Amino acid sequence: MPWQSVRILVDSVQAEPLSDALMEAGALSVSLEDADAGTVDETPLFGEPDHPSAELWPHSIAVVLLEADADVAETLRAAAAQAGVAAPLDYTVETVAEQDWVRLTQSQFDPIPISARLWIVPTWHEAPDSRALNLKLDPGLAFGTGSHPTTRLCLRWLDANLRGGETLLDYGCGSGILAIAAAKLGARRVEGVDIDPQAVSASRDNAALNEVDAHFGLPGELAAGEYDVVVANILTNPLKAMAPLLAGRVRSGGSLVLSGILAEQAEDVMAVYRPWFVFDAPASDEGWVRLVGVKR
């Protein structure tokens, strides 16, 4: 059965309420794109997968998928009325041939090489190198995967620096990918915490999928103690606020690995942590940085 793809020009005020209302009105999917993409007015937005950006583009295109027999004008009118915005007038409609959407989505994600020996492999793919350390994880998970520069930066540090036998804490574990990688790289004891119970559940499932011994829970469930390595791939403001907490979890001589930080934010973050840590030069990837400090 074919579908109708409707592209609607919306502003930042309309975008989210209209998108929600369209889903309730029967849309099969709604996604937002920058209407100014590819022009001098393009607005880049940055966000880690488990902490998406709260910003919206000044002008967006809402791409709406409707069933073939849906009344487009009536659907838009009803959704706009529910959202409390003016009914959109600037839109186009095209017919989209039926496709196997699951197969199409899967075809867009290939295994991700992190280093010479470390790969992230979607569960539906064969590992390109069966001798490598292959992390089984599906791109598109709500809690983050190795497709984001901050995650890659942290994974590369773990791959280059873990020698085996370490204790490691992943603070803000999301999908558990960093903790799982640490376990595969030989860390002796690996723990992860997240404030979101669903992230904790996802991390446990992913650890089981990868057949590693890593323990996950909420922050209040974490026992007292210090670690050889603490990694936190979250965002700048939470990292700054949690400086005393994270510093207290790293043993003297141990390493703190921070990411989720834009390049222009790096100095501010290091300044907050310098009472406890001596930092290496930041490593960067696509405008994001990784900071590594050694505890005094």
Curated annotation (Swiss-Prot):
Function: Methylates ribosomal protein L11.
Matching CDD domains: AdoMet_MTases
Protein name per Swiss-Prot or TrEMBL: Ribosomal protein L11 methyltransferase
Residues reported in the UniProt entry to bind S-adenosyl-L-methionine: 151, 172, 194, 233
Principal cellular location given in the protein's record: cytoplasm
InterPro entries: Ribosomal_L11_MeTrfase_PrmA, Ribosomal_PrmA_MeTrfase, SAM-dependent_MTases_sf
Entry EC number(s): 2.1.1.-
Reaction equations catalysed: L-lysyl-[protein] + 3 S-adenosyl-L-methionine = N(6),N(6),N(6)-trimethyl-L-lysyl-[protein] + 3 S-adenosyl-L-homocysteine + 3 H(+)
Record family assignment: Belongs to the methyltransferase superfamily. PrmA family.
Cellular component, GO, one term: cytosol
Coiled coil: none
Subcellular location: Cytoplasm
PANTHER family reported for this sequence: ELECTRON TRANSFER FLAVOPROTEIN BETA SUBUNIT LYSINE METHYLTRANSFERASE
BP GO annotations: methylation
GO MF annotation list: protein-lysine N-methyltransferase activity
UniProt KW Cytoplasm keyword: yes
The organism of origin for this protein: Thiobacillus denitrificans (strain ATCC 25259 / T1)
NCBIfam families according to UniProt: prmA (TIGR00406)
HAMAP family: Methyltr_PrmA (MF_00735)
Keyword list, A-Z: Cytoplasm, Methyltransferase, S-adenosyl-L-methionine, Transferase
Enzymatic class: transferase
Matches recorded under Pfam families: PrmA (PF06325)
